[in-house]
A protein has these predicted regions:
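A preference for well-ordered globular domain cores
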Residues: 1-89
Length: 89
């Protein structure tokens, strides 16, 4: 069983992989503005040990899944919109 820090780091690593993602994700990140929560998570994931968000993130365990779901939902929606646009052209 993972301790709290390991669990949160594993969520962060999985989310960071999503954010690094494939070419589509990179294009989506450039084209669409992400919500505030997602930007906070992105900032926290870039430098988790140095981030002012990481301590707060660790202290609110229930926030982890919410943030992960938010990131996943925003990227899924942005990718859908991007794919729709390229199909329309």
């Amino acid at each position: 069983m993972l301790d709290k820090r390991e669990y949160i780091q594993s969520v962060a690593n999985g989310t960071l992989e999503l954010l690094r993602g494939d070419k589509i994700s990179k294009l989506v990140r450039k084209k669409y503005t992400l919500g505030a929560e997602t930007r906070i998570v992105c900032n926290m994931l870039r430098e988790p040990s140095n981030s002012k968000y990481f301590t707060e993130f660790i202290e609110h365990e229930e926030y982890v899944d919410t943030c992960k779901a938010q990131v996943n939902a925003e990227f899924a929606e942005a990718e859908r919109r991007y794919r729709d646009e390229i199909q329309d052209t």
